[in-house]
Each structure stands twice: as C-alpha cells, then as structure tokens.
Amino acid sequence: MEVVLYPDSVSRRALEAASDTNSTFHKGHYMSIKRVEARYKRRQIKRQRNRAAQTRTATFENTSSLQSLTDAAYEACKTIKWKNSVQKYMNNTMLNTLHAHKLMTGGSKITGRRKCFTLMERGKIRHIQASPFWEKVIQKTISRNVLIPCYTRSYTHGNSANQRGRGEMYAIKLLRKQLARHYRKHGSQGWILLCDYSNYFASIPREKVLQQASERIQDKRIMPWLEQLMDAECDSGLGLGAETNQQLAVGYVSKIDHWIEEQSGCEATGRYMDDLYVIDSDLLKLRSTLDEIKRMSEELGLTLNPVKTYITSLHHGFTWLKKKWYYTDTGRIITRPIPKTIKRMRQHLRALARLAARGELSWKQITAMYHSWRGTLKHYNAWRTIQSMDAYYKQLKAKNETL
C-alpha cells in the first residue's frame, strides 16, 4: 500500500510501518495508514475550528459596525488629541461614525485627500502621504478586526514589528537572549547573516499582497476596502501612511521567517520589519541559507540590498537596528548606539536651540524632547554617551539663556 506524506510531523519509521495494513500502535507497534489518515483529518478539522474562532471578528458586518468604528476612533486619537482635525471629529463622534459606516457599507469611496510631505528619518529620506483622521478611523477598524487576527496568529516568534507586546525593545531583548545562548554553546566563535531589502515598501508587488490577503481573509467583501486604501497611497507598492499597509508589509515575508525557523536548521533568527538576521556556527550553512532567502525573495518580487546584506563574524561584532553589538572577553553582550546616531542628535539639538533663540520654541518643549530621546539610551550600554550628551545639552541651554 502506498504511504502518503503529510505536513504533520510523522516519523519515517511510522510511515514505513504504516504501509502494513495490520500494523497498530498497540504495544510498541505503529499505526496503520487508515489511522494516520484519520488522525490527520482530525487535526485539520481542529485547526480550521481554531482558525475560525480566532478570526471571528474578520467579517464585513463586524468591521463596519457602529461599535467597531467608535472603538477604532477612540483608539486612533489616543496620541494625537492635540490636533484640530481630531478634536473636530471627536466632538461629533456619533455623526462621524455614522457617516463612516455608510461609506463602508454603501460601496462608496473610503479614502480622502492625502497630505504629502517628505521627512528625514535616521538619515533616510521618506516620502509620506498622510490621510485625514476620518480615514484613519476606517484603517484602524480594518486593522484591528481583520488584519491583526488574520495575520499575526501565524507569525513566528522572531517577528517583532507591529504587534501588541512586541516592538524594537522586544527584538533587542530577543537578540540578546539568542547571543547569550550561542555563547554558552560556542563562545564568541560564530557567524551572523544580516539581510536588508532595497526600498521595501515601494517594491512590494501589490497583486501578490492582495492574493496573500485573499488567502487569509475568508470574507471576500473586505477585499475592495484594501484595494481602495492601496490605490490611494501610491501607484505601485505600498505607501508609508496607512496603518493597514504596515500590517500587510510585516506579514508579506512571513513565509521566509517560517522557512528559516522550521527548515533551514540554523541556530537563531529574528526580523524587525525588513531587517533580518540569522545566527549559526556553520559558515557554509549560512551561505546556503542566504542563497535560499534570495530565491524566495525573488519569488515575492523583492530584492536584497547588496551593501547591507552580508555575513560577518560574531567575534568582531556587527550592526543591527542602528546599534553596535559585540561580545567582551567574558561573554558579556554590549549594545551601543552607533556614532552616527549621536552626531545626528547633536545637530538636531543645535537646530532646536536656534529656534529657541528666535522665540519659535520654548526650552520646556526642547527639554521634554531631549529627555524622551535620552530615556531610550538607558536600555543600552551607553553611560558615557549619556553623560556627554547631558553636558552638551546644558552647554547649549546656558549659552542660549545668556543671549
């Protein structure tokens, strides 16, 4: 009898023995092929039942309901209540929620006029298209009720971006834990593969994103909403302004995460948005892993940045998420911000001091901004950097007060 291979973890010996119709699992014997098939079907039914329970909110009616839109409005305004447009919307929450409900259920246009601007983020120019607040409410309800339950349940442990309870600090703590485990086994001898995609958001093929979303979302009436939000952002790829695009972009390369963790055999891995790393003690294994990542990325329509994608030794240290990582002689893991980050912050403080000298900004506002940035350094080994920046900040403030 032919033995069928299933996606489950079934041992080779069990499958070989399953070809015998008389074999059982009793007293050390293996199951027959019929029992293997029956168990596989039960597992599939259980998975489908669990998936349906987890995505029960991902329906057209629930996503566009007045209650979901109201909850989304209060969630979306949490950090931007000082804005005039937000205050106008929240002063008439009931009427605005009803209007959004009619737009979503009536097949009308759910996107508004974009406000386009360019900003410099950590030395990189980013073109942003900001949507009006009423559209952000619609994006929030789609993200909360559809994308998060349909996507995040299948994310790997190392996927750190755009999830509740995760973020940059989660990614940093995870990498520290993995580096500590590696040192206990191999010392500082080992290798790390660092990958970064070229122009990640803009290069994501829109057709493949929609196809992936269609496979995850059962209610197909939701798909026109996603298509409208994508078309309003830009002509190709995904824009940086919509929350829905952030969720779709994080989940787009989840297939690669699963392959690395489950099939590559590498020691450790993690990803924050489009910044990926893989750790292993075998250099040849990492090279073959890189070749497979390139192949899978090409299938997804993405291209790895040749400058930022490389393999380096853990002994010499590496840079990830704008932080310098390395081992000491005793195995302690040191994490420090790169010098470019500190230099850029000094330039920023000088620019703010000039605004304060002209009376366009108060030092109370500058102090709040500086202490917010300073608080992030406390999570790293940057005591000397903090002392140096404090002295520089006090020098600028004293010089400004004497003018």
Predicted regions: what they are:
Residues K102-K124, V137, R144, R221-E233:
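Reverse-transcriptase-like RNA-dependent polymerase core
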Residues R56-F60, S143-A202:
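Active-site-proximal segment of RNA-dependent polymerases
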Residues M1-L98:
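Non-catalytic, polymerase-adjacent accessory regions of viral genome-replication enzymes
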Residues I125-T156, C234-E262:
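Conserved pre-motif C helix in the palm subdomain of viral-like polymerases
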Residues E75-Q87, L119-Q129, T156-G158:
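Glycine-/proline-rich flexible loop or hinge segments
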Residues E2-R43, S131, K136, K140, ...:
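Right-hand nucleic-acid polymerase module
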